[in-house]
């Protein structure tokens, strides 16, 4: 672990943003995902190179930092390798690989933004007509962020959590069953309802992370 774990309690959000400087997205790596048939037996490294063929290394992060970039977002699909018992337990090997990549950045004193990113189509469950299906989305979201926040609770402000990416808003109506193609979803939320649920999701995220303690 290359992060000191010491929080600067006096640092404001504006000051933190200035320290983060220019950012870069480590795209098409740990957020890569596919069907159960496509990814059966995958290791974390298999997922990481599923959409492109170059695993992230210390050299990767050193090179990024050499161009003056001081923060990196690590988009992550946490459903990869999770348990199938309905408890949404994230595989420990997957946690370890994410942490390894984080430490590549921390070795350069960089900042890391970690989120739930795409992660297949389960976000569309938030807009399903069936309330029981919507609850499944809430259960997964809470289980994921509880585990993520607990796992990384002792890192300093060099680790920043982001609730989600473009899955929020009208994407909450996505076709999570893959019953159709194209960009139109099958959810029943109105536009106003989509953004009300988005606000609710983000507040839930804050509440979950804060409740885990540590440096959160």
What is the role of each PLM region?
Residues 56-121, 140, 198-213:
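Aromatic-lined substrate-binding rim segments of carbohydrate-active enzymes
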Residues 24-29, 75-77, 115-119, 162-167:
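Active-site-proximal beta-strand/loop segments in catalytic clefts of secreted hydrolases
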Residues 48-53, 64, 90, 133, ...:
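Pocket-edge positions in alpha/beta enzyme catalytic cores
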Residues 36-45, 78-96, 120-137, 172-187:
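Surface-exposed, active-site-proximal loop segments in enzymatic domains
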């Amino acid at each position: 672990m290359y992060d000191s774990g010491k929080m600067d309690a006096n640092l404001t959000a504006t000051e933190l943003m200035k320290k983060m400087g220019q950012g870069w997205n480590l795209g098409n790596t740990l957020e890569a995902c596919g069907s159960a048939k496509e990814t059966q037996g995958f290791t974390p490294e298999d997922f990481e190179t599923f959409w492109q063929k170059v695993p992230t290394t210390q050299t990767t992060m050193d090179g990024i930092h050499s161009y003056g970039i001081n923060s990196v977002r690590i988009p992550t699909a946490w459903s990869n390798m999770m348990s199938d018992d309905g408890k949404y337990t994230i595989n420990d090997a997957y946690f370890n690989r994410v942490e390894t990549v984080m430490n590549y950045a921390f070795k350069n004193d960089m900042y890391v933004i970690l989120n739930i990113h795409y992660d297949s189509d389960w976000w569309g469950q938030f807009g399903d007509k069936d309330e029981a299906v919507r609850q499944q989305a809430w259960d997964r979201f809470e289980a994921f962020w509880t585990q993520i926040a607990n796992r990384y609770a002792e890192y300093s402000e060099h680790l920043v959590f982001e609730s989600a990416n473009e899955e929020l808003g009208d994407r909450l109506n996505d076709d999570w069953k893959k019953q159709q193609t194209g960009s139109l979803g099958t959810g029943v939320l109105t536009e106003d309802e989509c953004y009300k649920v988005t606000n609710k999701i983000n507040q839930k995220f804050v509440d979950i992370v804060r409740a885990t303690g540590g440096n959160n």
